């Protein structure tokens, strides 16, 4: 019964981790919580029973077991096959340089058939799958590469890219952290980890955290409301709004006057921005930080 409790504890731990992810609806998260409570009741296990924890997470145990049963024994690969597989890998690499990703996948697949215990072939195929937008297949290939070589940092890094593309930011952070543990000086892993962590913060909070811009706080800010009211009392703005309403209900065309209205609107907007800068500069700085943050994320993703 002790071994069964270890297994159930691992399952409960996995379900609890899943219930805390934002990929599920509130109803689905509630169902996971019910499942956890049922298992704890039936097997008389509580979160305090940490002595039942195993060293390896359930997902890693499953991946390792699955991949061991999914690939052929190493003894089935003969030297001739290994040599041919390496040639196919080189062909696949050339296809990648030429951006012929489908052909690259085909070459790596043939290499795997000849030498199924080479982690590099799975990892390279994962890169090609990601280029084709086949992120789920890329993750599977990375998992197989890791099962063969658990210290293969590049496999963790490429799995992080695929997970990020699927908006699985929490798992992506874990993958990048493992990649950095194995290759601490890799700037690409550091950059991509920061991006994944930032994305995770953004999706974890409705109003955003860190450098994210809180529009609700801006709109509800008393100083902002006061300045907006002052702007609407500006005679130029009132005249502009009156002219716009006249045109909207079929009045005379704007003509040259329309250009004057536009100039007045720009001038009023500039005055409003100056008032915010003078009376509440932290709001302007928050907006600037938000724009800088978005620009950094876009640039980093494009060069990952």
From Swiss-Prot:
The modification Phosphoserine is found at residues 293, 295, 297. The modification N6-acetyllysine is found at residue 131. Pfam families: SGTA_dimer, TPR_1, TPR_11. Coiled coil: none annotated. It comes from the Eukaryota. InterPro entries: SGT, SGTA_dimer, TPR-like_helical_dom_sf, TPR_rpt. GO terms for biological process: post-translational protein targeting to endoplasmic reticulum membrane; protein heterooligomerization; protein homooligomerization. TPR repeats lie at residues 15-49, 85-118, 119-152, 153-186. One of its GO terms (molecular function) is identical protein binding. GO terms for cellular component: membrane; TRC complex. Keywords: Acetylation, Chaperone, Phosphoprotein, Repeat, TPR repeat. Co-chaperone that binds directly to HSC70 and HSP70 and regulates their ATPase activity. Homooligomerize. Belongs to the SGT family. This is Small glutamine-rich tetratricopeptide repeat-containing protein beta. The lineage of its organism: Eukaryota, Metazoa, Chordata, Craniata, Vertebrata.
């Amino acid at each position: 019964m002790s071994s069964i409790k270890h297994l159930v504890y691992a399952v409960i731990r996995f379900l609890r981790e899943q219930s805390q992810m934002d990929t599920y609806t509130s109803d689905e998260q509630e169902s996971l919580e019910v499942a956890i409570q049922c298992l704890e009741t039936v097997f008389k296990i509580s979160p305090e029973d940490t002595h039942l924890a195993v060293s390896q997470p359930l997902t890693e145990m499953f991946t390792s077991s699955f991949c061991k049963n999914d690939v052929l024994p190493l003894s089935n690969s003969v030297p001739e096959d290994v040599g041919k597989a390496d040639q196919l890998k080189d062909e696949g690499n050339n296809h990648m340089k030429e951006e012929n990703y489908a052909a690259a996948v085909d070459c790596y697949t043939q290499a795997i058939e000849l030498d199924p215990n080479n982690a590099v072939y799975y990892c390279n195929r994962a890169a090609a799958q990601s280029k084709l937008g086949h992120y789920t297949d890329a993750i599977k290939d990375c998992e197989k590469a890791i099962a063969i070589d658990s210290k293969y940092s590049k496999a963790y890094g490429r799995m992080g890219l695929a997970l990020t593309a699927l908006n699985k930011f929490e798992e992506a952070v874990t993958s990048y952290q493992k990649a950095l543990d194995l290759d601490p000086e890799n700037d690409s892993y550091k950059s991509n980890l920061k991006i994944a962590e930032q994305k995770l913060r953004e999706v974890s909070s409705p109003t955003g955290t860190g450098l994210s811009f809180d529009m609700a706080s801006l709109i509800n800010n008393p100083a902002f409301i006061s300045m907006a009211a002052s702007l609407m009392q500006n005679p130029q703005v009132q005249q502009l709004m009156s002219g716009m309403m006249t045109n909207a209900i079929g009045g005379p065309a704007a003509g040259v006057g329309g250009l004057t209205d536009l100039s007045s609107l720009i001038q009023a907007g500039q005055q409003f921005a100056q008032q915010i800068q003078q009376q509440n500069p932290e709001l302007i700085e928050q907006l600037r930080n938000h724009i800088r943050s978005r620009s950094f994320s876009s640039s980093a993703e494009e060069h990952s």
